[in-house]
């Protein structure tokens, strides 16, 4: 049985406080307060190893975009992917990472865990299960490989939220999605700065005419993410 809409909105509003904090380019990671302890307040139920405690998906999943549950589960699927990636990086960072880079990636890990748990709790019984991921194409011992993978995930995440916004029917969900994507955009800018200091962004993600970040439809996002998601994800009613 799905969570009642009123209960969902109340839960979203209560748990979203961490996403509304003011962020600065170099100190944005501080918005998590006391790090893991601060995140734990909204990531209640997250295991000590930061894993997703939802049962694994058997076969595949179908995301039905006829209502907001489909859009929220779409975001939840992508946050599962990002959280899994950063958990692996933070648990065993490349030897080429500096001490501050290790700390930043650990903090980003907590952000993504918070996002994942946020959507899981908002969806309640309507949430999809845990997706199986495959990071075999990423060399987690190599700094460049990890940074380029992180760049791909963050850029894709921003484009995904931008493209899904028009499909959200509930105003409160749209506002909260906007707050989450602003955090993802800060992640993306930071990763790009690590790869090429001072770059911040680029014409591959920001339209030179409009000055807006790229927006991608769910089918295009999932096609790109499919490289890392073993579970078959289908979409209907786009």
What are these regions (language model features)?
Residues 15-36, 43:
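N-terminal secretory signal peptides and thylakoid transit peptides that target proteins
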Residues 2-8, 15-18, 33-34, 49-238:
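All-alpha RGS (Regulator of G-protein Signaling) helical domain and cognate RGS-like helical scaffolds
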Residues 40-45, 49:
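Hydrophobic membrane-targeting alpha-helices
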